[in-house]
Amino acid sequence: MSQQTTPNAPGWAPDSWRSKPIKQCPEYPDKAALEKATNELKTLPPIVLPNEIIRLREHLRDVAQGKAFLLQGGDCAELFSYCQQDVIESKIKLLLQMSLVLLWGADKPVVRIGRMAGQYAKPRSSPVETINGKEVPSFRGDILNGFHPDERELDPNRLVRAYQYSSATLNYIRGAIGSGIADLHGPLDWGLGHVRDPALKSKYQETVDRIQEMLRFMHTIGADQNEKLSTVELFTSHEGLLLEYEEPLTRLLNHPSVRSYPPDSTTPPKKEYYNTSAHFLWIGDRTRQIDHAHVEYFRGIANPIGVKIGPSTPTSDLLPMLRTLNPNREPGKVTLITRYGADKVASLLPAHIRTVESSEYARTVVWQCDPMHGNTQSVSGGIKTRKFSDIFSELQQTLRIHKEEKSYLGGMHLELTGDAVTECLGGGAGLDEDDLSTNYTSFCDPRLNEKQALELAFLVADHYRQERKEKEAERRKSSVV
C-alpha cells in the first residue's frame, strides 16, 4: 500500500480502501488482465480537471446555504451505446428545460449535474440471474460485463473502454455547450420533443415568455451580453461503485488557487487528491458502511460527494458518517440523497433532518431528494416500474417536511431520459401496465420520460414560487405594522 496521505484524511491513500471489508466487489477471474487495464488507466490523462471540481464545490456550497438549487439526472445504467450525438443532446436539452423551469420558479441559480459520462456500473442484489432457464452472471453495467447473456463474463478491458466512452461523451457535452446549445436567448430551440400535452406545453411556453421578456428588457438597457446568458456549466457524476476503476483515476494534483505575479517561489502549491473520472461521485445505499472500503476511499478525495440514505439508514449513522467524510465541516462537501419511498418518507425523514441540523453540521449538507429508488415495484411478467404518483408524492412530501423542519431541500436526483419511453406508470399521459411494452428500453431501472420529468420540475418550481410569495406577503405585512 502506498504511504502518501492527504492533510484532511490522516492515514489515507488512493489504495487504502483495499485494507477494508468491501461489498459489491467483482471478482475478476483474469488478474493479469485486470492489472494491465488498471495500469493503462494510470497513464491516461484526467477526464475532468481540478478547476472544474473546485467550481462545483463552490456551487454546492451555495446550495447548502440555500442560495441555489441542484438538479441531477440521467440514466439509471448508462450504456456505451448511448455515446451518440442525438442521445447526449436529448439529455442535455431535458436538463436545460427543467433548469429553466426551476430558475423561473425558485428564483435561484440552478446547478446541473448529469448522471452521464461514467454511470456504467450498477450494484446488484444477486450475483446471478436466470434467463430462459439458464443461470448466468447478473448484468452489472457495461464497465463490467455485457447485457447479452453471452457477454456476462467479467472483462477488465471494459475498464479502459469505460474511460474512452466517458471521455468522448464529456467531450461532446463540452462542445455542444460551447457551440451555444444552452443559449438562454433561444430556449424554444431546445424543443419539447415528445411532449404533446397542451397544458404542459402552455405552462412551459409561459415560462419561456417570461424569460424572453426579461431578456428584451436587458437588451434595451444594454445588459444582455453576459456570457452566463449564452452558456451553462454541466457537471458529470456517477456512483463510485467500482473502486478498481476509481483508484487509478485518483490523482495528486495542484489545487487551482489564485496565481500571483510575480510567482511566489517560497510557497509550494497546495496539492489534493482528486478523482478525475467525474466531478461528483456518490456512495450507494448498499455500500455506505462506515468501516468499509467505499467510505474509506471517499473520505480522501477532494471532490464533492453524495451519500444515499434511506429506510435502512440508522439515525445514529449520520453524524459518524459526516465526521468521517467531512471532518472540516465544509458546506456543500457532502450531499445527503434521501430515498425512502412515498409510504415511508413522512416517518423517517424528519428524524434524519433533526439529527443533522441540530448538530455541528447544521447548514453544511446539501439535502437532495431521490424520489425514484424507494418506489420501484414489479408488475405482471416481472417488469420493473415506478408509479409517477408515488414519485410525485415523495417529492411533494419531502418539500413539505423540509419546510416544516425549517431546513432547505436543495436538490432532486432523478433517473430520466429525453426519449419517449414508457417505463413509469401514470403522469399526465396516464400510462398503465399495458403501455409499458410500447417503448420500454431501460436495461436496469425504469426512467422518467421528458413529460414526466418536466412535471416534477414544475412541482418544485411552484413550491418555491409560492413560498416566495408567502415571504413577500409577510414582509409587506410587517412593514405596514
From Swiss-Prot:
Reported modifications of this chain: The N-terminus is blocked.
Entry annotated with the keyword Transferase: yes
SUPFAM superfamilies for the chain: Aldolase
Region (Disordered) location: 1-22
Membrane-crossing segments per the record: none
Enzyme Commission no: 2.5.1.54
Single GO BP term: amino acid biosynthetic process
Top-rank EC class of the record's enzyme: transferase
Gene3D superfamilies hit by this protein: Aldolase class I
Family designation: Belongs to the class-II DAHP synthase family.
Name under which the protein is recorded: Phospho-2-dehydro-3-deoxyheptonate aldolase
Gene designation: aro-8
